[in-house]
Curated annotation (Swiss-Prot):
Family: Belongs to the MOZART1 family.
The name this protein goes by in its record: Mitotic-spindle organizing protein 1
Keywords: Cytoplasm, Cytoskeleton
Keyword check for Cytoplasm: yes
Cellular location(s): Cytoplasm, Cytoskeleton, Microtubule organizing center, Spindle pole body
Cellular component GO terms held in the UniProt record: cytoplasm; gamma-tubulin complex; gamma-tubulin ring complex; interphase microtubule organizing center; mitotic spindle pole body; spindle
Superkingdom of source: Eukaryota
One of the protein's GO biological processes: gamma-tubulin complex localization
Stated role: Required for gamma-tubulin complex recruitment to the microtubule organizing center (MTOC).
InterPro entries found in the cross-reference section: MZT1
Length: 74
């Protein structure tokens, strides 16, 4: 690999590490992979507010589904 590619990869890793630290402080419960995917989506034109809304909605739906499965008789 050319040194420039290694530098870019290292810089990207550092950015994700910093974002993960911020994410942890804000209790977002997003891991590094999820943050990386969010960054990629935003870099490709996805509206950050819309992305945040989708993540919140998916978490709400997942929580409701989990509760429903725990409450249903087997």
């Amino acid at each position: 690999m050319p040194p420039q590619s290694d530098d870019k990869r290292q810089a990207a890793r550092e950015v994700i590490d910093i974002l993960h630290e911020i994410s942890t402080l804000l209790n977002t419960n997003l891991d590094r992979t999820e943050l990386s995917l969010c960054v990629s989506l935003i870099e490709n034109g996805v509206n950050p507010d819309a992305l945040a809304t989708v993540i919140k909605d998916l978490r709400t739906e997942a929580g409701l589904a989990l509760r429903a499965s725990n409450e249903s008789p087997e």
